[in-house]
Regions:
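Residue-level marker for buried hydrophobic side chains located in beta-strands
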Residues: 34-36
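Short acidic, Gly/Ser-rich segments with clustered Asp/Glu that frequently serve as metal-coordination loops
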Residues: 38-46
Length: 209
């Protein structure tokens, strides 16, 4: 199979790891950085009616800015329940995204939002802003998964890219709880700059939704 791009040398890998470390340090030192994670009813590419069922934002001090369950206004599919553990009974009577969305938009305005697999979280969020006629605020984004995958340096020749790494479960709590995933992402950034060396308490987290 023809390679899509040249296999990086060890020197190139070292330089890229330094750049990823510098990115993590910059994000941790920037008080405008917020860590985002959402749990949903599904994946937009497979289900255009996907809704958020939980959302969390954490600042770089580890303080939750918001963490709440959201009523999706539709039954939560069993496959989603099996991943994040959120069922229909848990969201009865809670606000939906039409109510929660403006709060999220206000919180991320002029911020730098970091997410693990940001293409999923940010794309879903912006899609729902549009669906509910919520003005999309100005904000910057970056993907912790892309940075961490480059930092790990596992090259996939058939892809011509780094192997995507699952989110290490560095924070205690249930996998696929949005607040736990935010904290794991924050601790991962600290690990990348050498400020956190504890072993993950359990398994890695596969962030499908």
């Amino acid at each position: 199979m023809k390679l899509k791009s040249t296999i990086p040398s060890e020197d190139q890998k070292a330089k890229i790891k330094e750049e990823a470390t510098a990115w993590a340090k910059e994000r941790l030192l920037d008080h405008n950085t917020l860590i985002l994670d959402i749990e949903t009813t599904g994946i937009l590419a497979q289900d255009p009616e996907t809704e958020v069922v939980q959302v969390s934002l954490v600042n770089t001090s580890g303080r939750p800015v918001i963490s709440m369950l959201v009523n999706p206004g539709r039954p939560i599919p069993l496959v989603a329940q099996q991943i994040h553990g959120i069922d229909d009974r848990m969201v009865i009577g809670l606000p939906n995204f039409r109510v929660v969305g403006p709060m999220i938009a206000a919180l991320i305005k002029n911020k730098h939002v970091v997410a693990y697999n940001a293409s999923f979280d940010i794309h879903t969020l912006v899609h729902l802003f549009g669906k509910y006629d919520i003005p999309v605020p100005d904000f910057e984004t970056s993907c912790a998964m892309e940075a961490y995958s480059a930092w790990c340096g596992e090259w996939m020749s058939h892809k011509g890219d780094w192997k995507w790494q699952k989110l290490p479960k560095l924070a205690f709590g249930n996998s696929h709880d949005s607040l736990v995933d935010c904290m794991s992402t924050l601790l991962l950034l600290k690990k990348m700059v050498g400020d956190f060396s504890d072993e993950p308490p359990t398994e890695d987290i596969d962030l499908d939704f």
